[in-house]
Amino acid sequence: MSDFVPGLEGVVAFETEIAEPDKEGGSLRYRGVDIEDLVGHVSFGNVWGLLVDGAFNPGLPPAEPFPIPVHSGDIRVDVQSALAMLAPVWGLKPLLDIDAAQARDDLARAAVMALSYVAQSARGQGLPMVPQSEIDKAESIVERFMIRWRGEPDPKHVKAVDAYWTSAAEHGMNASTFTARVIASTGADVAAALSGAVGAMSGPLHGGAPSRVLGMIEEIERTGDATAYVKRALDNGERLMGFGHRVYRAEDPRARVLRRTAKELDAPRFEVAEALEKAALEELHNRRPDRVLATNVEFWAAIMLDFAEVPAHMFTSMFTCARTAGWSAHILEQKRTGRLVRPSARYVGPGTRNPREIEGFEDIAG
């Protein structure tokens, strides 16, 4: 029997051509292209094309003018439900019954609808929908999203969201991507795989940490002393959000490109964030010189999204939008392998027992 590996950590379950997180060198490449060369240079819609097709064009198409059919008051619930409903509405067929070209087209249609649904749900029912004629004036997928959500977005905010989505578009075998591949491996339709991935993303251990960085920033703005805050937090056994990563043994490359972009866009909280980062890295190194605890993507993602006036409760939804690119690429790659993902579990429960040994048997036995 194979060795038991809790959480499957370190287990190689797939071979992929999509992304290469270089944990030692602190770099992240999408099909060989470093994200340093993508963020701020190639828009998210074309990065979707790179990840899915290996080419920038045609990229992600505009979303179809389809109103979101669910209004629960929770963006994740709305998007996850609405995605699943695309299958009967559009007549999506199981991946098992279609070829790769059809799967790719289905993924493009469904993935961009996820962005549309996030924007529509975030706008809410209290405001009228933005006319399609206004949305069609946009020059990029990200700008279309922002117009659908807000009506007239600040161009700098569009650049900030584009940078974040590109940097967070794909990151190898994480929980939501694994979920998408498992569902795809069953031969289910693409909407089912995307919907399942959205559910996995909703867990705070995967998609919920960036919003927690803002609390630290706000406290330092109040006190004006980043070093004192860091020392007090660590002395109290608190975790500094935005530092350390399970993959990288060097600085998270996504943090690096988002820091650069935040400075280029003159984000108001850049200096406070930079002071916190410097104080945290110095104190963490002093206390744990044997460990590499560098800045991760969550830290500067929070600064970028805050700059773009994205409310904290939407941070996970924005992460979801970004990761639709990686999910789409992995779903298509899994479709091409054609192999069902079926790991094993080692039984460690009780041995053979008589029902009479189970508590409550006397109450239910006839």
Which residues are covered by each model-predicted region?
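Hydrophobic alpha-helical bundle cores within soluble ligand-binding/oligomerization subdomains
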Residues: 1-366
